Amino acid sequence: MNAIPRVALVWLLVAQVLVILPHLAYMPLWIAAMWLGCAAWRVQVFRMRAGYPRAWVKLALALLAGAGVWLSRGSLVGLDAGAVLLIAAFILKLVEMKTRRDALVLVFLGFFAVVVGYLFDDGFLAALYSLLPVTALLAALIGLQQSAFASRPWPTLRLAGGLLLQALPLMLLLFLFFPRLGPLWSLPMPGNKGVTGLSESMAPGDIAELGRSAELAFRVRFEGALPPREQLYWRALTMERFDGRRWAQAPQWSGEDALHWQKRGPELRYDVIMQPSSQPWLFALDVAQTDQTDTRLMSDFHLQRRQPVEQRLFYRVSSWPQALRESSIDPRTRWRNLQLPMHGNPRARALADELRQAHAQPQALVAALLQRFNHEPFAYTLKPPATGADGVDDFLFDTRSGFCAHYAGAMAFVLRAAGIPARVVAGYQGGELNPAGNYLLVHQFDAHAWVEYWQPEQGWLSVDPTYQVAPERIEQGLEQALAGDSEYLADAPLSPLRYRGLPWLNDMRLAWDSLNYGWQRWVLAYQGEQQGAFLQRWFGGLDPTRLGLLLGAAAILSVGLLALFLLKPWQGRGDLRSRQLRRFERLLEMHGLRRSPGEGLRSYGERAARVLPAQAPAIAAFVGAFEAQRYGHGGADDPGLRLRALRRALPWRLVRTPTRDGRGEEQA
């Protein structure tokens, strides 16, 4: 009685394949080899051609699995190593499984492994796929409660699917109303190792490397009209330190006392879904305020969280691009934004002196420097020539080829040398409009650098020297600015972004991205603050008491509707036998046996038994039970049970062969 039924074993094997398959994307290949070996062993045990492993064999297998995790991950702790250990235990449990209790443990391990998979991929496609292993695991769970003589797996699968559909209303209620509790602890996500994106320091060629990447940085949806593309400068961080080669971020502080700015111009409101970056800063237009309680506006006007962004983050922002930022600055900030190395780049310093002597007003000097970039033969490229120790000199006077970081770094250097406080801002510019969802896609190749310089009474002013060399980069995007450049998206040769010239393929790409965006915005982003806003909007807010009453009422309503669906009280009980008879006739009609007008039930059953001799006992049992119930005293077997037995006994596939009466005969 405690043996594992064949149907349950079949679905356990199928479920293991479906559970393990998505994990193989980030797990060592020996996991797949381990499953193949253990599955073959378990099948041989079921066929009584092999025995269960002994204690020393199980110990050896466990030690080998642990050694494999250590060699492939370098540790036995942490989320990455723990996931591999979980899958290894899930596989090894299959071999030692003897009783139904062991099988239950395996099923619950499978459900847990499905949930762990969301830590590595929580996209829409992964969520859709997870329905397959969950259904198979539920079928295995149902199979464990069935008779050992049940041999067909498909009815069990249909029952599992039906149970999942019945659970949908309760799932939706819990999703909408169950309080979101914060985690007790957090771990860095292993999937974010080697994330492509901006870093806290910048050499001239660093941002150019991002032009080779097609990875997504974030998505943005505006309330109202979309601003012009040339106004979309997404600030990430500000770089104020320069060592002669690299620009780097200086220490920043936050707080109302540290920020001096005034709102001016129209307010822009928008939502951002940011991809994991493993960095603490958020992307926003100037000057930004957000609804994130753990995020602050820093003294250089960039948004920063307390913790790095290790998973997709949804946040709302209000920005004032025309705001006045620091009409006066303290001496420390001024000194930091005038700082230059003592030596190096003499020609750039001489150019700064020349411009300062020719232009008394700082804005005139800035305009003259921009005009120099515009009129002289500078080139915009992802693969500029290498420069020496005096990189600014080499770029301005020799190579004259570079990416946005070259132009921003060189301009900030010259402005500082001319006595104008200046700094480099790193972030993203522009974005691709997805008309299917009316939102912007900002990719890593949209990474950009520009310059801010400070003027009394006017505060920090933004200027982009790249616009003077390649205006199409700002107005149309990087693809238009680098048409024909082999380095563009060089790290993504198969990216659909390379084929935006094919309308049908581009439309498919945007439609799929819109589906993913909706999943992330309305499902993954439905957390504490978003849930509170939803409840406030539709229910005027819910305290714990009202929430409990609402959930209780919803649960009672769901159970009542489910009971109505299952019991169908509107169908009269007196007509039950007629419905069973009609089901019996439809079942045989599916196999080519239609009841003739005026043909009695017993004659119909005898004819069906001749055509389907293998199912003759089941047919006779139903006819006998039906006649006893209809014409006897109701003490015989339930014909409904006999009908289900007949349905299980009928063959899956039949081939028609001619008979003497010409009606045809079905053979398995």
Swiss-Prot record:
Induction remark: Is expressed in both exponential and stationary phases of growth. Appears to be part of an operon together with PA2874 and PA2875.
Enzyme class: transferase
Keywords tagged on the record: Acyltransferase, Cell inner membrane, Cell membrane, Membrane, Transferase, Transmembrane, Transmembrane helix
Active site: 404 (nucleophile), 448, 464
Side of membrane Periplasmic, spans: 28-50, 96-103, 180-548
Intracellular or extracellular location(s): Cell inner membrane
Membrane topology term: Multi-pass membrane protein
Residues in coiled coil: none
Main localization of the protein described in the UniProt heading: membrane
Domain of life: Bacteria
GO cellular component: plasma membrane
Known catalytic reactions: L-glutaminyl-[protein] + L-lysyl-[protein] = [protein]-L-lysyl-N(6)-5-L-glutamyl-[protein] + NH4(+)
The UniProt record lists the keyword Cytoplasm: no
E.C. designation(s): 2.3.2.13
Keyword Plastid: no
InterPro entries: Bact_TGase-like (IPR052901), Papain-like_cys_pep_sf (IPR038765), TgpA-like_C (IPR025403), TgpA_N (IPR021878), Transglutaminase-like (IPR002931)
SMART domains for the chain: TGc (SM00460)
Phenotype of the disrupted gene, per the record: Disruption experiments show that tgpA is essential.
Cytoplasmic side: 1-6, 72-74, 146-158, 570-668
Transmembrane regions listed in the UniProt entry: 7-27, 51-71, 75-95, 104-124, 125-145, 159-179, 549-569
Molecular function terms, GO-annotated: protein-glutamine gamma-glutamyltransferase activity
Domain notes: The transglutaminase activity is contained within the periplasmic domain (180-544).
Family: Belongs to the transglutaminase-like superfamily.
Function, as annotated: Displays transglutaminase activity (TGase) in vitro. Plays a critical role in the viability of P.aeruginosa. Might contribute to an essential function linked to the cell wall.
Additional observations: Unlike Guinea pig TGase, TGase activity is not affected by EDTA addition, suggesting that TGase activity is Ca(2+)-independent, similar to members of the bacterial transglutaminase family.
UniProt-recorded name of the protein: Protein-glutamine gamma-glutamyltransferase
The organism of origin for this protein: Pseudomonas aeruginosa (strain ATCC 15692 / DSM 22644 / CIP 104116 / JCM 14847 / LMG 12228 / 1C / PRS 101 / PAO1)
